[in-house]
Each structure stands twice: as C-alpha cells, then as structure tokens.
Amino acid sequence: MSTQRFTELLREQNHTTWEKAVTHRFVQELFDDTIDDSVMASYLVQDYRFLDSFLVLLGASVSTADALEPRLRFAQFIGEIAGDENTYFLDAFKALGVSDKQREEIPNTEPTTAFCALMREAAKTRDYVAIVTVLLVAEWLYLDWATRDSRPLPKNSVHAEWIRLHDFPEFHERIAFLREELDRVGPARRAVAQDFFHRAVEIELAFFDAAYAHPIIGEK
C-alpha cells in the first residue's frame, strides 16, 4: 500500500510547471539581489491585487471547514494577512517609488485576473476541498522557492523581506496545516483537488512571467 501523501501526489502530477515556477528567473534574481526595480514593482503591484479575493477565499474556508480547530486556524490566518504582509506591501511601494495613482490605474495582467477569478470560483463552490487546494498552492509554492536557496538574505530590504515573509516558522506551520487538511479531505474529492491544483500552478508560473512583460517605473 502506498504511503505517499495526497498533497505530494498533486505536486508530482504538476511537477514540470511547479519546478519552472519555483526556479523562475524572478526567484533567482531575487536571491541574487539583481532584480530590476521595475520588475519588482510590477510583481508587487499585481500581487497586492490578490488581497481582496484572497480574503474572500479565506472567509470561505472559515465557513466551510468541518470543525472548530481549522476554523480557528483560518481566522488567525486572516489576521496575519491583514497585518504584517499588508504593511510590507505599503512600505515596498514607497521604497520603489510606486505612487497611489499608479497602483490604482495600472490594469491587471492576465494572470492576476485569472488567479483572482480562480480564488473567487473556489470560494463560490462552498467546497472545502476546492478552497483548501487553491490556498495550498498559493502558499506552498512560495514556501518552496523561498527555502531552496540557503544563501544569506539580499541586502535590498524589499527583496529580503519578501523572502522572509515566505520562510519563517509560522509560515512553515501554516503550510503544514494546509497540507494536513488537504491530505485529510482531498482523496474523497480527488477530481476537484486535481483540477484546482493544476489550474493554480499554471497561473502561478504565468504570474512570474508577467512581471517581466509589464515592468513599472516608479513615479517618485
């Protein structure tokens, strides 16, 4: 009998795309401290657009979880997202010279629109498996790239803090929890988990590509 975890199986089924994402040029340049400000600005402006849909998805996780313990974990997660991570974005925009006007007027890239739609689709299903699957990809893929390079953090604080936000003890615990939840409930809804996992990973890779296709020059 196989002892492979369900979440590991899902990642293996998307191995090629997952590896392209976690070893992307963006990740390499981030650790090298060579990523251009215009690329970093584009990436962060678009990533910040996820916040509203991500909170919708987290809200759905609270209401569809089947026990108190996971509800409490997701509620805690909401507080964390609204705190330190939100502060990072605002500080980074200031450091990169991205004005409020730019943040408001620059349109979504296709991957941004696609991932926001996927999160809202998962939330609308009221299917706990779909919801946890999308949450897991959004977090686990980032933990993977953030922990693959053992070099000291970059000197640029915008780069260093983005890495740190995806490699600290509580973040590791969050991914462990999400994996345990999907390992627990996913096998009974295998097709749903496979579908949402595959689509989420594909969009994550496209999102990295888009940062280079749509650079943003700060105004101030």
Q: Which stretches of residues belong to each language-model region?
A:
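Acidic, carboxylate-rich catalytic segments that either coordinate divalent cations
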Residues: 193-220
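Active-site-proximal alpha-helical scaffolds that flank and shape metal-associated catalytic sites
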Residues: 45, 69-170, 198, 202
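Hydrophobic alpha-helical segments
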Residues: 2-6, 118-121, 209, 213, ...
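Short alpha-helical hairpin
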Residues: 11-36, 175-184, 217
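Long, non-globular segments of proteins
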Residues: 4-5, 9, 145
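Long amphipathic all-alpha helical oligomerization modules
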Residues: 171-197
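Structural helix-adjacent loops and short alpha-helical linkers that scaffold large soluble proteins
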Residues: 65-69, 191-194
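Alpha-helical bundle segments that constitute or directly flank the non-heme di-iron/ferroxidase center
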Residues: 15-20, 34-64, 80-84, 133-143, ...
